[in-house]
Amino acid sequence: MALMSALTASAYAQEVKYIEAPKFEGQIYLYGEPDKADVEYEQWYEIQNRGQFVRNVKVPALIPYLPEESKANGAAIIIAPGGAFLHHTFGSGGYEAAEWFRSQGFAAFILKYRVEITPREEAEYQKYVADKMAGYRAGGLSGNYAPATPDYAYEDINAAVKLIRERANDFHIKPNRIGIVGFSAGALMAVYNAECAPLECKADFIASIYGQLVMRDMPDKLPPMFAAMSSDDELSGQSGFEIIQAWQKRGIVELHLYGQGGHNFGMGHEPFTNSLWPAEFLAWLRMIGMINAPANEAKIRLNNGLDMPQYAKPTDLAHTVRQQNRHMMQSLRH
């Protein structure tokens, strides 16, 4: 499934400016050296106040944002942008996320996964999107516009985890400290990976950021999941929380439901409290022992029988990280 994020008429009422494809240092193709024509088929563009987008992606790749070795915390984050599997939103849920996670010591990778091939002319593309949305509404899906997720998107997220795990030494990370942070459609990929991927392709933790929480048949054990969304999100906020209750029985899960902020808030929009999710996510990772775990960690036994590291005063940590996060976001946006 996918969410029709950033595809509303209001988004496209603004001027669309097509640009040359950015040159990414160290870009890693998932399946070997690609055909040049397939790479050049991508279409990159900008929308005022919304950042960069790319559509017609035929060749999946990882775009690395690696920290200085002295600052590395040993963990990796794969960032899966949103865009309804029709495009990628590379602004706050792409570049900004990668820069922030790198600043916190993570080896960050933006996953440019394959998306649906759409009309190249802008007017035809807008009509194509409008027709799709009309079809979803006519199908009785209310605010949750959820077409089928392409199998190749799932293949790409699994391949990305496997590649990074196999090259853990190259990236100065631990092979059991690889996570996925997915935004909107990318969040669906993260949840799918946690539920369905083979062991060698499965992430060690995931974050679902304003993703629709879709209930599937679940395995007995699941990796830790952090979920964040706004209660007024007309795309994802109405899907219910059955999956959260089911996850509690199979693993560690934390849900942050913010009162306002809508959909597509990326790394957070001040003054909304969703601007705190990166700091809360970082504190959560420390609490569950994914980063900065002490050598002689104490354990607490959860109701579901799982052991979890226990740390002193996690609220103090969260407060400190929130302050750091606020300063970082301000510097990135100016």
Predicted regions and their residues:
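Conserved alpha/beta-hydrolase "acid-adjacent" motif
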Residues: 234-240
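Primarily recognizes the serine-hydrolase "nucleophile elbow" in alpha/beta-hydrolase
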Residues: 151-222
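Short amphipathic alpha-helix adjacent to the substrate-entry channel of hydrolases
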Residues: 91-110, 245
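N-terminal cap/lid segment of alpha/beta-hydrolase-fold proteins
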Residues: 15-71, 103
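Short beta-strand element of the alpha/beta-hydrolase
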Residues: 73-82
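Alpha/beta-hydrolase active-site loop
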Residues: 124-169, 277-280
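Short beta-strand/loop motif that positions the catalytic acidic residue
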Residues: 226-229
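C-terminal catalytic histidine-bearing segment of alpha/beta-hydrolase fold enzymes
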Residues: 252-334
